[in-house]
Amino acid sequence: MGNTNHKESFVSKYVFSQDHKMISKQFLITAIFMGIAGVMMSVFFRLQLGWPGESFAILETFMGKWAPNGVLDRNAYLALTTIHGTIMVFFVLTAGLSGTFSNLLIPLQIGARDMASGFLNMLSYWFFAVSSVMMLFSLLVEGGAASAGWTIYPPLSVLPQAMPGSGMGMTLWLLSMTLFVVSSLLGSLNYIVTIINLRTKGMSMTRLPLTIWAFFITAILGVLSFPVLVSAIVLLMMDRMMGTAFYLSDIFIGGEALDATGGSPILFQHLFWFLGHPEVYIVLLPALGISSEVIATNSRKPIFGYKAMVGSLMAIGFLSFIVWAHHMFITGMNPFLGSVFVFTTLLIAIPSAVKAFNYITTLWRGNLRFTPAMLFSIGLVSTFVTGGLTGIILADSALDVTLHDTYFVVGHFHIVMGLSAIFGMFAGVYHWFSKMFGTMLNTKLGFAHFWLTITCGYGVFFPMHFVGLAGAPRRYYNSSSFDFLSETADLQPIISVFAIIGSLSQLIFLFNFFYSIFRGQKAVQNPWKSNTLEWTTPVEHIHGNWPGALPEVHRWAYDYSNPVHEEDFVLQTTPLKDGEVGH
């Protein structure tokens, strides 16, 4: 039974909580602060890229010795790009999406009192929190933060003497990511067990909302892929500290040969990208699941092709494990092997196209309600399609030889993964904010936030494709130093202006978010007139979610505009009428 009189201390309620709803808020707020740090870093290095060598007081204020006289240091530039990428991919888009919305929605949408293990759920958050602090702390150590790129390729990540940032900063990066993986595994195992074992009466797998299917498949991807990253990190740490040579062979530093032979840095790339490409969908699938729910709810129509949507999630999840080497076409692999990975990569376009088609068909002739969540979900469909089209180009090994490690790649993955995932995250926050905090976000501020974000998002990353087609490599500190980049030099300030405006526009969201928590309009139980079980719980959080017996499910989650019923929505707990055919 749910309990409205459950007494807790401040520590047990807000710090070491085992309640899935509080843990979801802990993940979200931590991810927001990590996102602030990651976005600030991007602004700092975009100032350098847009106006090379110019002095900016803000750089000296925040960066200190790493920006003497307001000019960003070369090594600090590499550190910022490395930590920015790491924070945004793992700490914001992975933990911010899965940690927040899996925790919030899985028990509520399947009709469970809580997660299978509240204790493991608590541990999952605190491993993530400690990992976050450690990653940020690495910016403060002598020698600087890790600077080898977010992919930390050897030998720069193996040899402490290789470059500034390869010492203690890199060690902290490796330890932080190990803790992050532990957090991810604890959470993923909990999500899988909860979905399989704790569904309420009548909640068959074919009645699950698409959000739950997305979280379920994402958790499976995490359990299968993240341990491989830990294995790669363990071998790398052994190379760094124990004299092994898993990733080193015939290395010269300062003209002197190191006593390390027999290893291969390509081995690390295989291990990293075996996680790295499933990671793309660990980030994307929750966003797609959230958008499925938001689009159906605000179209007032059943989701088009429910079974095809589930099948496409499964197909994307499976294919994500057999495409990793498309990141490695230029490593000298056998051309036949390269063609195999070209084929498997192009196959992902099929289930991806199914999802895009079904989203558009759901919207077609629907009674559309343009809430901020709906706009961000439609924005996700836009970025998913446009970013996916450039992915088809990069999937061709012959084209990738030219475009590899250029701004074309940066533009591609920021649109298809970065913008799509962050749009899904924003859609989820706007849609379920009332369920998390009991108040409503300001809609007008939400509209302003969306239009500024999508305009600046495309303004930043669309021009990067042209810069990349001109041959501009990514991670260059000063592209104006090279004559062959002069044709696209004028685009860099434009990109930086959009990046700065887009970053500042997030202040609208931050104000709306924190103001609404304390001063927002009180929410009603089901503000969006949605069908799923979370909207049958009280606005005020209680332990066990429902005050009485657990709800019983009689129908699927997308019974919108059913002519048998007067309302244009039907809760899953509503019994079937005589003669009504259920799902």
Predicted regions and their residues:
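Membrane-embedded and interfacial regions of multi-pass energy-transducing membrane proteins
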Residues: 1-583
